[in-house]
């Protein structure tokens, strides 16, 4: 059986429990075709880069799947019908990533808290540069710019 990573976005106005129920429904579809879901990650509600079906935020979830192609076809068909699913993407992979995904590692890094000021190192004072001096007269302004069609 082939290995897949499947990410889907669910509407922001449904609860986390409803997202879990949707994930369980997808798992049951995969298992009905003798496949298995090896890992499930809920990434939380995140802002979208642009509006999708009038939503600015969405619940993000990742599934690592080991299943035949027919199982994926049926799962994607059901996701297309479900109004709570905004987008989904399934990628075939050679092997599943061990441990937490990159998104979960990034979220853990964000939870480190305030780190305080960082050392800046030695820097010259701004006053050491000296005066700029006179800039000189400006060149005369051309009044015929509009006549040339530049503006």
From Swiss-Prot:
The keyword GTP-binding does not apply. One of its GO terms (cellular component) is cytosolic small ribosomal subunit. Residues 105-144 have a biased composition (Basic and acidic residues). GO terms for molecular function: small ribosomal subunit rRNA binding; structural constituent of ribosome. SUPFAM superfamilies: Ribosomal protein S6. InterPro entries: Ribosomal_bS6 (IPR000529), Ribosomal_bS6_sf (IPR035980), Ribosomal_S6_plastid/chlpt (IPR020814), Transl_elong_EF1B/ribsomal_bS6 (IPR014717). GO terms for biological process: translation. Keywords: Ribonucleoprotein, Ribosomal protein, RNA-binding, rRNA-binding. The keyword Transmembrane does not apply. Residues 94-151 are annotated as: Disordered. Gene3D superfamilies: 3.30.70.60. Binds together with bS18 to 16S ribosomal RNA. Belongs to the bacterial ribosomal protein bS6 family. This is Small ribosomal subunit protein bS6. It comes from Beijerinckia indica subsp. indica (strain ATCC 9039 / DSM 1715 / NCIMB 8712). The lineage of its organism: Bacteria, Pseudomonadati, Pseudomonadota, Alphaproteobacteria, Hyphomicrobiales. The gene is rpsF.
């Amino acid at each position: 059986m082939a290995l897949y990573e499947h990410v889907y976005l669910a509407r922001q106005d449904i609860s986390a429990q409803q997202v879990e129920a949707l994930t369980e429904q997808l798992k049951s579809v995969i298992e009905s075709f003798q496949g298995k879901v090896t890992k499930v990650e809920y990434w939380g509600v995140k802002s979208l880069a642009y509006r999708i079906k009038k939503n600015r935020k969405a619940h993000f979830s990742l599934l690592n799947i080991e299943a035949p192609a027919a199982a994926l076809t049926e799962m994607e068909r059901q996701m297309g019908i479900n109004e709570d699913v905004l987008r989904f993407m399934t990628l075939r992979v050679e092997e599943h990533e061990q441990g937490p995904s990159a998104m979960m590692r990034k979220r853990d890094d964000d939870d480190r808290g305030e780190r305080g000021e960082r050392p800046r190192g030695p820097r010259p004072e701004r006053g050491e540069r000296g005066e700029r001096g006179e800039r000189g007269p400006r060149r005369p302004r051309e009044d015929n710019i509009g006549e040339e069609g530049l503006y």
